[in-house]
Amino acid sequence: MSKKRLHEIAKEIGKSSKEVVEHAKYLGLDVKSHASSVEEADAKKIISSFSKASKPDVTASQAVKPKEVAQPSVTVVKETGSEHVEKTQVSKPKSRNFKAEREARAKEQAARKQANGSSHRSQERRGGYRQPNNHQTNEQGDKRITHRSQGDTNDKRIERKASNVSPRHDNHQLVGDRNRSFAKENHKNGRFTNQKKQGRQEPQSKSPKIDFKARAAALKAEQNAEYSRQSETRFRAQQEAKRLAELARQEAKEAALKAQAEEMSHREAALKSIEEAETKLKSSNISAKSTADNRRKKQARPEKNRELTHHSQEGQKKNKKSWNSQNQVRNQKNSNWNKNKKTKKGKNVKNTNTAPKPVTERKFHELPKEFEYTEGMTVAEIAKRIKREPAEIVKKLFMMGVMATQNQSLDGDTIELLMVDYGIEAKAKVEVDDADIERFFEDENYLNPENIVERAPVVTIMGHVDHGKTTLLDTLRNSRVATGEAGGITQHIGAYQIEEAGKKITFLDTPGHAAFTSMRARGASVTDITILIVAADDGVMPQTIEAINHSKAAGVPIIVAINKIDKPGANPERVIAELAEYGIISTAWGGECEFVEISAKFNKNIDELLETVLLVAEVEELKADPTVRAIGTVIEARLDKGKGAIATLLVQQGTLHVQDPIVVGNTFGRVRAMVNDLGRRVKSAEPSTPVSITGLNETPMAGDHFAVYADEKAARAAGEERSKRALLKQRQNTQRVSLDNLFDTLKAGEIKTVNVIIKADVQGSVEALAASLVKIEVEGVRVNVVHSAVGAINESDVTLAEASNAVIIGFNVRPTPQARQQADTDDVEIRLHSIIYKVIEEVEEAMKGKLDPVYQEKVLGEAIIRETFKVSKVGTIGGFMVINGKVTRDSSVRVIRDSVVIFDGKLASLKHYKDDVKEVGNAQEGGLMIENFNDLKVDDTIEAYIMEEIVRK
């Protein structure tokens, strides 16, 4: 039996769902909400209950019922006695219906207008109330008046809730005119048991009273019914609109499908005509027929599979006895989906049956006359370059006997043979190593002869220590550089530029100490002219000879400046004669070298020296092209804590600009800032100009070449490639153990090493220190430089020193506070210096202390045993007398008997009489005991000696 939901019943009878739920509960049905379901019989019972519209008791007053509206339930309570008062309870509406209230008030006003003389009769009624007839009437009248006042109060409260109007105005309407209009009806229905006695002379008659609550409830129910009918009408209109919209949508969809089908038919017809045209042009019908057969077979296979699937499903259905309804629904959905899928497949199959689109012919391209190839090009790359199909090239290679695919690399010979077959001239591409900076210094063909201009000469000042090199530069620059140098010697290269007679001269100041040989050689390699300073009082010194050799090796002209001619012992002629022995011959003697006698301290003949420099530069014809990208050499490099790597560069060709991508040695970067020799920021540097730059990712080596690249990407690639090559070269230089050097390697393991970590302010000082320390010769000990770098001593250096048991040497640098604290904690030694030869001396002493000490025996004295005493639990005590030297408590002794040493050991005790003493002198007597020896005899000789350490020289 089917079921109905309560909200469906409410919709059917035009009632609210809440009323239907209440009626169902009243009838004893187990329902919870409007969504609850009831049986068909229960539904009919609910509908019939609404149609009957159950009435109250006969004795109770009833309200007027509108058509098809259920009367609200009214409960009447009667009181017996003289008062005869009735109490009426009316179910309150759930919500106020203002429209119903307005209609009720309109009806009341219309009834009031129809009444004649309402105001006059009401006045008489008021006067009648004031005239009581007798005691009984007054008593009953008082009671009725009291009851009426209570009724009026209740009526007023009901009217305030219903109409939200003035209670005073409502009182007149309800009590006056409405009572007269509905007097007969109220009396007939018996709503009111109390009669209004005011203004009447019949105190015992009972006039009916209007039940306004019931009236309002009836109006409310009528309005609800009207609203339900309107809602149902709107709902049916909406449903009809939806149905019409759905029909319109389906019609539009069918029209679109029809148009699409027509378009597909036109397309199929066009494709069919194209296929017929192509079949006429094809010479071979066999291939077309086989293709069609294959397509028909492919179409037949799915049908066969579907038939097999259908039969298998029927068999399964026969075997299965019962099917679940839910499974049937799901299978039905799947079957519909498969049906749609088959339809789509059918469309695709239909499209596959149509002829394929004609292949557009490739546009013809002329073959190039020349083809530049590289080793290892693939077939696809060659085809793209000559604008041919890869399959065509593969075919040609196959005819040539070469099996290749389009992604296979070909060698140069195969590519040349292939190009000959095509009639193209093949040329191998000359690959340029972008990471090779040295090619710019070896080949100058990239320079433009039209842009070559004269450049400033680069002059290097060389000479022995304290011969006046820095003093000369100080005089030239009018600055005090020499006073800032530690120990009066120059520690690293300084590059400066001065102007003389409108022309610029760049000076490089090189150190004169023996440790800076590599720096002097580097200075000579970048210079144009060398000024060799020789002190007139000292003459030629070892570093002077070294500077001469460097200049000759670099092939640069030499100008000799004989300095300190103001000193009393100056002898310039001796200097000229000594230099002649090394091939430096003055022009006065018929040579090619210019000699100038100067006094750098007193600024004597300085102008003459500068004029000589400009004259030699003019003879050398120094030229440069400032328009090309800059190249040059690193003069010095250091690491700054705030700025990072700082490199002093000497521009040799081109112009260096800020933001230029640059490769310096094995590192790369971009020129972030540029500072000249005066400490001023500049935006560009022309040839022969020294500048300091920042922006490198690492600190380069002094003497490295640099070059500016077109973009940062190329500079990065070149820098990384150079760094990779340097690392590979370093690994190749690692010594491998072989049978030939196995003995030397094992022997080297016996040599003690002093591990050092070098940190300096500039790269040149690092190189000089490392080279000098390695050259220290102490037999059995060598220096091992664990790490060397520029910059302050940091925590990582201390950690490395602790791990390798090394000493940290700081040259013109200081440790950070954190590094100093860590060094104190880890007990790592840090030595700070500013003069190089003191570093060398200190390390040499440490190397000597590393060797095992060498001891030499020293005899202190001799003694003769005069008497022996044997003491139990102690041993033998020998009484002796010193015959030579002395015997000490901490000395070793030998027991000699018959000129044969029978024991060698330590003294256990030494006494003079009963006192323990440290030594017994010559011609004194005493007693002694020897450790682990009790075989002392009279006349044994006791020889006392010690081992002394020999100081190494």
Curated annotation (Swiss-Prot):
Annotated ranges, domain tr-type G: 454-623
HAMAP family assigned to the protein according to its UniProt record, in alphabetical order: IF_2_B (MF_00100_B)
Biased composition range(s): Polar residues: 191-207, 282-291
InterPro entries reported in the protein's UniProt record: EF-G-like_DII, IF2_II, IF2_N, P-loop_NTPase, Small_GTP-bd, T_Tr_GTP-bd_dom, TF_IF2_bacterial-like, TIF_IF2
Record's keyword annotation contains Cytoplasm: yes
Name recorded for this polypeptide: Translation initiation factor IF-2
Gene Ontology terms, MF aspect: GTP binding; GTPase activity; translation initiation factor activity
Annotated region (G3), positions in chain: 509-512
Subcellular location: Cytoplasm
GO CC annotation, single: cytosol
Extent of Basic residues compositional bias: 339-348
Region (Disordered): 52-247, 279-363
Family, similarity comment: Belongs to the TRAFAC class translation factor GTPase superfamily. Classic translation factor GTPase family. IF-2 subfamily.
Organism: Streptococcus pyogenes serotype M5 (strain Manfredo)
G5: annotated span: 599-601
Coiled coil: none
Region (G2): 488-492
PANTHER family tied to this protein: TR-TYPE G DOMAIN-CONTAINING PROTEIN, TRANSLATION INITIATION FACTOR IF-2-RELATED
Gene3D superfamilies tied to this protein: 1.10.10.2480, P-loop containing nucleotide triphosphate hydrolases, Translation factors, Translation initiation factor IF- 2, domain 3
Keywords associated with the record: Cytoplasm, GTP-binding, Initiation factor, Nucleotide-binding, Protein biosynthesis
Its job: One of the essential components for the initiation of protein synthesis. Protects formylmethionyl-tRNA from spontaneous hydrolysis and promotes its binding to the 30S ribosomal subunits. Also involved in the hydrolysis of GTP during the formation of the 70S ribosomal complex.
UniProt entry tagged with the keyword tRNA processing: no
Basic and acidic residues bias locations: 80-89, 98-111, 140-188, 229-247, 300-317
Spans annotated as G1: 463-470
